[in-house]
A protein has these predicted regions:
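N-terminal Rossmann-like or analogous alpha/beta NTP/dinucleotide-binding catalytic cores
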Residues: 1-86, 136, 165-166
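Active-site cores that bind ATP or allylic diphosphates and position pyrophosphate for catalysis
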Residues: 18, 63-166
Length: 166
């Protein structure tokens, strides 16, 4: 027994389709699929549009920067220049165009248990530091979902095979 939460993951503004959210709700209604909470319904964990949760994501990326778990890269002549000094980074985000990257400890391997594949291991030396905040100020899909899953108390996530490593 669980709850069906409808969350609108609209962080990719370049692919945003107007009224797609109402079409999703209409399709769910057509098939008599009733969500327990979401936009305009039992808003216990709202807002349910990720584009309306930017301050929450900002709080978390600032915490990551302060704890040296993430860093900014400032755009300069089309290149991303990393800034690892926390104080300078916090100043630059006020005035510069930037992205935030998660700092990966490339000396490690991560092991997880997947219900379908069993034990899976990832070698972090093969992974670049991923961008978690894009230059438009919006979080990436992965960063927003981890934060939202935590705050919405999501216990089970079902995604396609292509998302396993993320």
């Amino acid at each position: 027994n669980g709850e069906f939460i409808l969350r609108i993951e609209d962080t990719d503004q370049s692919r945003k389709v107007d009224s797609a959210d109402s079409k999703i709700i209409d399709q769910l209604n057509y098939f008599n699929i009733d969500f327990d909470e979401g936009p305009n319904k039992n808003e216990k964990f709202g807002p349910y549009y990720q584009s309306q949760r930017l301050q929450l994501y900002k709080k978390h990326y600032i915490d990551l920067i302060k704890n040296k778990k993430a860093y900014i890269c400032v755009e300069h002549n089309g290149n991303l220049i990393p800034e690892f000094d926390v104080d300078l980074a916090l100043e630059k985000i006020k005035t510069s165009k930037f992205v935030v990257k998660l700092l990966i400890n490339s000396d490690k391997k991560i092991s997880i248990y997947d219900e379908l594949r069993g034990d899976v291991e990832f070698d972090l030396s093969l992974i670049d530091d991923p961008i978690i905040i894009k230059s438009d100020g919006f979080p990436t899909y992965h960063f927003a979902n981890v934060i939202d899953d935590h705050y919405m108390k999501i216990s089970h996530v079902i995604r396609g095979e292509e998302w396993l490593s993320s």
